[in-house]
Swiss-Prot record:
Alphabetical GO biological process terms: galactose metabolic process
EC number: 3.2.1.23
Reactions accelerated catalytically: Hydrolysis of terminal non-reducing beta-D-galactose residues in beta-D-galactosides
Chain's gene name: lacZ
Family: Belongs to the glycosyl hydrolase 42 family.
Protein residues bound to Zn(2+): 114, 157, 159, 162
Organism: Heyndrickxia coagulans
S-S bridge residues: none
Protein name as annotated: Beta-galactosidase LacZ
Cellular component aspect of the GO annotation: beta-galactosidase complex
Binding residue positions for substrate: 110, 148, 311, 351-354
Keyword line: Glycosidase, Hydrolase, Metal-binding, Zinc
Active-site residues, Swiss-Prot/TrEMBL: 149, 303
Length: 665
């Protein structure tokens, strides 16, 4: 995956330019003590590298790169384009982005550039070329890091450059203005266009903007950011074709289509910042699986906090053992490296209260640094794990374009949001220790025994046909309410809901009945009554059988959850948002029927995850509780972290982790 990738990577963002050179020597000593072998540098250094448009100064970066090489530490060398210098904004004010109200953003923080600014792109390209020329053969160079967290702060711009770019993008997509009018349903509200130049960005309008205009604009902005990444990547590849190139994604980050971007990267990395106030941050765990799934290969955890962050309203610190536990959680789900932001906590600037691997005190005996040292030295034992695959028989469909479409305005209920619909399914599977891949609608489904597609509102005919073939050939498929409703042009499938899925599911939904916020109703199930929220609907059986029934109001007695035998497989439909206890029982039943089982039985709160490398299997056992737990491993196996053979009954201390190495015969 990485250049000379023979070990598990460990380190963090290193910003020595913020410190006097007298501190650097101490940094090298502490890095060696902590087992650091890899650092990200130069991410926010443009202003130092280029004091004006004609002048470049690489003297400090030269020293940093040489120092890393001398100490055997690899460099993830960034292109420094994430924060343009003040002189650029002053000289080229139209490089600054514009918000929906028409106000231009000011410099003074970061990411203050319009994705379609020709001046920004020209100057960024020139800088990247100089960096690539200078360091292409440097012994410290391991990987290129393009920009930083695209779309984190500025994912949309409403300037004239973007307006013209959007018009050009639309011409390329649709070919003719009539094709656009048809796709956008412009005969509604007298929105028909006759010239491309008539089309505006979906900015501030009296009421709801055209839905397809909004969706195309989101895709255009995603493409615009990706074009900047590809520009830098192509320059780097010209000088170093064999050095991996990536940028750090942000997991469940709505503006940037991860599947779209992953095709353009040599490996995928992401920045994870779970909230320590959550006992088990399932959304972050889900993002690990999503990130790995973007290329179906190991990823790097490029940033996490050693303790607290600084940008929430209340910034909890990670309790003793939590940083270590959550780091191994990333490794269990496919990470081949664990990195932090940042190495040394900053003395000044906006993130000075964001924890570092080295705290403000510099105290080697602080809990913060002792945990950093412990983890770094333990990870040296994971070389065998690097490059191994994550084992999963179950997939969840994830589609950014569907996410964008589902959460547009003017839908039946604003309570129906994408991640909130996916997360209960993921959480149930995680607690049952069922490995999960995420798949794009264009990917093959056949290798999975079960495929879940919650909240799949936007469905192409091609995908619906693929699902039907999958089920007919023996697959198990499950979706829920408000799915199969609209096509890729945001046009409703006629003939009755759930549109594209009607035949597969064997049902007809006559009408939606969204629930009031906070309302709780009941359904009758084979496991007893269960609470439901958010949504009800009138379902008619057209070949399916009912598994649960609504109990309240005019829907009382009508089906709420259904199953439909279709060919050799089965398709399930959940017409409401049930409580997690019922969802867990239902999913367990589906998994059992599809012959999907966890690798080991474990007590609640103990996670079992599997990575495989040929006949070698690595069982990660993670205790997410504050109690001692025991797991029957079914045999005695070598344990990688502690370097000893574990008894058949494995003892896990509170928040402890063990990794069993199993050779399959």
């Amino acid at each position: 995956m990485l250049k000379k990738h023979e070990k598990f990577y460990y380190g963090g963002d290193y910003n020595p330019e913020q410190w006097d050179e007298s501190v650097w020597k101490e940094d090298m000593r502490l890095m060696k003590k902590a087992g650091v072998n890899y650092v990200s540098i130069n991410i926010f250094s443009w202003a130092r590298l280029q004091p004006d448009e004609e002048t470049y100064d690489f003297s400090t970066l030269d020293k940093i790169m040489d120092m890393l090489a001398e100490n055997g530490i690899g460099a993830d060398l960034a292109t420094a384009t994430a924060a343009p210098p003040a002189w650029l904004s002053r000289k080229y004010p139209d490089s600054l982005p514009v918000d929906k109200d028409g106000s231009r953003f000011l410099p003074g923080s970061r990411q203050h550039y319009c994705p379609n600014s020709k001046d920004y792109a020209r100057l960024a390209a020139k800088l990247v070329r100089k960096i690539a020329e200078r360091y292409k053969s440097h012994p410290a160079l391991v990987m290129w890091h393009v920009n930083n967290e695209y779309g984190c702060h500025i994912s949309e711009c409403y300037c004239d450059n973007c307006k013209k770019g959007f018009q050009t993008w639309l011409k390329e997509k649709y070919g003719t203005i009539e094709n656009l009018n048809k796709s956008w349903s412009t005969d509604f509200w007298s929105q028909r266009y006759y010239e491309w130049e008539e089309i505006c960005l979906p900015g501030k309008t009296p009421t709801f903007a055209n839905p397809m205009q909004q969706l195309d604009y989101k895709a255009f902005m995603d493409d615009s950011l990706l074009a900047l990444y590809k520009m830098e990547r192509d320059i780097l590849k010209t000088y170093t074709p064999d050095v991996p190139v990536m940028t750090n994604l942000m997991g469940l980050h709505k503006p940037v289509d991860g599947f779209h971007w992953a095709k353009e990267m040599d490996l995928v990395t992401w920045d994870a910042y779970p909230d320590p106030f959550e006992d088990i941050p399932y959304a972050q765990f889900m993002a690990h699986d999503l990130t790995r799934s973007l290329k179906k290969q190991p990823f790097l955890l490029m940033e996490q906090a050693a303790g607290a962050v600084n940008w929430r309203a209340q910034n909890a610190v990670k309790a003793p053992g939590v940083m270590r536990l959550w780091s191994y959680e990333a490794a269990a789900h496919g990470a081949d490296g664990i990195m932090f932001f940042q190495w040394r906590a900053s003395q000044g600037g906006a993130e000075k209260f964001h924890s570092g691997m080295v705290p403000h005190s510099g105290d080697e005996e602080s809990r913060n640094f002792r945990e950093v040292v412990q983890l770094g030295n333990e990870l040296k034992n994971l070389e065998k794990v690097t490059g191994s695959a994550y084992a999963s028989d179950v997939a969840i469909v994830f589609d950014w374009k569907n996410w964008w479409a589902l959460e547009l305005d003017s839908k039946p209920s604003s309570l129906v949001t994408y991640i909130k619909q996916l997360l209960p399914f993921y959480r149930v599977l995680h607690t049952q220790n069922i490995g999960v891949d995420f798949i794009h609608p264009d990917e093959a489904m056949d290798r999975y025994k079960v495929v879940f597609a919650p909240a799949s509102y936007r469905v192409t005919k091609t995908f619906a046909d693929k699902v039907k073939a999958y089920v007919e050939n023996g697959g198990y498929f499950a979706t829920n309410f408000f799915s199969g409703i609209a096509d890729e042009n945001e046009r409703v499938y006629l003939g009755g809901y759930p549109g594209a899925y009607r035949d597969i599911l064997g049902i007809y939904v006559e009408e939606f009945a969204p629930m009031k916020k906070g309302a709780v109703h009941q359904i009758r199930t084979g496991y007893g009554d269960a609470a439901i929220r958010v949504w009800e609907e009138k379902i008619h059986l057209k070949g399916a059988e009912a598994l649960a029934w609504f109990k309240d109001g005019y829907l009382a007695g009508s089906p709420a959850v259904t199953a439909h035998h279709c060919g050799k497989g089965k398709a399930y439909y959940i017409g409401t948002q049930p409580d997690e206890q019922y969802l867990s029982s239902l999913l367990k039943e589906i998994l059992k029927e599809a012959d999907v089982r966890p690798a080991l039985d474990a007590p609640r709160g103990v996670e079992v995850a599997v990575r495989k490398n040929g006949h070698e299997k690595f069982l990660f056992l993670l205790n997410h509780t504050d109690q001692v737990q025991f797991v029957d491993a079914g045999g005695t196996y070598p344990e990688l972290i502690y370097g000893r053979t574990e008894a058949e009954t494995v003892r896990l201390s509170p928040r402890d982790v063990k990794i069993l190495q199993v050779i399959e015969k």
